From Swiss-Prot:
Signal peptide: none
SUPFAM superfamilies attached to this UniProt entry: Inosine monophosphate dehydrogenase (IMPDH)
SUBUNIT field: Homotetramer.
Residues the entry annotates as binding NADP(+): 108-131, 216-239
Enzyme Commission designation: 1.7.1.7
Coiled coil feature spans: none
Annotated GO biological process: purine nucleotide metabolic process
GO cellular component, one term: cytosol
Protein name per the record: GMP reductase
Length: 347
């Protein structure tokens, strides 16, 4: 046993210090990034935000809606090959280039993903997702996926430390997914005591990944557009959003009605709700590490997408970054004890 005494920070612990700017308008800010990925060699341009690969976020409808904003969607792994075929038949190449195919690490997952990728060559992204990316089995699966799909861009996680980030990149991942426990419907930290404050995880993993020519996506912990800006400021190449995109018409959650008001169910992928839906219940040897919440219906996701992108542009103007690419270079974080004036929050 040992204790690390370095202070680790989450998004709520900091604000971004404003700096002199020559920008005249938020409209002057370019949010589109252009990337060429280390292993796949593929190039991609777009807004580097990803809708999370959750049942109640990463849907085909979400992918179609967010593609118009140049935003990616990691489509969850529970759609059948036939459902994928129907989606592909009704989608343009522009939509498909904004789609990630999500998979687990079982043999069945591998075979299913292979079938999906064979449906259309425009599917260039694979998202290999497990709760704990520290297992040897996971690293071996990433290497297997890289060998099988040498020209596909592979995103893999989740991890929170630099050395594991490096191992995944060396094993074939182009993008490493960073985050254990920060999600809005994740209870891993309270069920297991395991986790890492998200901003520090992003800063440390970005440093490790960029040293090898890899990239990271900050997954979890964002509750506001300001948090998205902080993640990019901390060095994230991409930011993945779950709760901020839940509860919309495109989210795919079950709708329930209480006292005449409609709500949408949103749950973590290790929650009892998810395990009952996909594997028949919680296995006797494990505990659920997610929760289910009821969200008031929020309408079309386009309004939320505009709000997030608008906040991000504004953050860039406050620090003088004319492009999103410049945000991390222009960011100075200050530690704080408060984020906002909350006097009217309960009204």
């Amino acid at each position: 046993m040992r204790i690390e005494e370095d202070l680790k920070l989450g998004f709520k612990d900091v604000l971004i210090r404003p700096k002199r700017s020559t920008l005249k308008s938020r409209s002057d800010v370019e949010l589109e990034r252009q990337f060429t990925f280390k292993h796949s060699g593929q190039s991609w341009s777009g807004v580097p935000i990803i809708a999370a690969n959750m049942d109640t976020v990463g849907t085909f409808s979400m992918a179609s809606a967010l593609a118009s904003f140049d935003i990616l969607t990691a489509v969850h792994k529970h759609f059948s090959v036939e459902e994928w075929q129907a989606f592909i038949n009704n989608s343009s190449a522009d939509v498909l280039k904004h789609v990630m195919v999500s998979t687990g690490t079982s043999d069945a997952d591998f075979e299913k993903t292979k079938q999906i990728l064979d449906l259309n060559p425009a599917l260039n992204f694979v998202c290999i997702d497990v709760a704990n990316g520290y297992s040897e089995h996971f690293v071996q699966f990433v290497a297997k996926a890289r060998e099988a799909w040498p020209t596909k861009t592979i995103c893999a996680g989740n991890v929170v430390t630099g050395e594991m980030c490096e191992e995944l990149i060396l094993s074939g991942a182009d993008i490493v997914k960073v985050g254990i426990g920060p999600g809005s419907v994740c209870t891993t930290r309270v069920k297991t005591g395991v986790g890492y404050p998200q901003l520090s995880a992003v800063i440390e993993c970005a440093d490790a990944a960029h040293g090898l020519g890899g990239m990271i996506v900050s997954d979890g912990g964002c509750t506001t557009p300001g948090d998205v800006a902080k993640a990019f400021g901390g060095g994230a190449d991409f930011v993945m959003l779950g709760g901020m995109l839940a509860g919309h018409e495109e989210s795919g959650g079950r709708i329930v009605e209480e006292n005449g008001e409609k709500f949408m169910l949103f749950y973590g992928m290790s929650s009892e709700s998810a395990m009952k839906r996909h594997v028949g219940g919680v296995a006797e040897y494990r505990a659920a590490e997610g929760k289910t919440v009821k969200l008031p219906l929020r309408g079309p996701v386009e309004n939320t997408a505009r709000d997030i992108l608008g906040g991000l542009r504004s953050a860039c103007t406050y620090v003088g970054a004319s492009r999103l690419k410049e945000l991390t270079k222009r960011t100075t974080f200050i530690r704080v004890l408060e984020q906002e004036n909350r006097i009217f929050n309960n009204l």
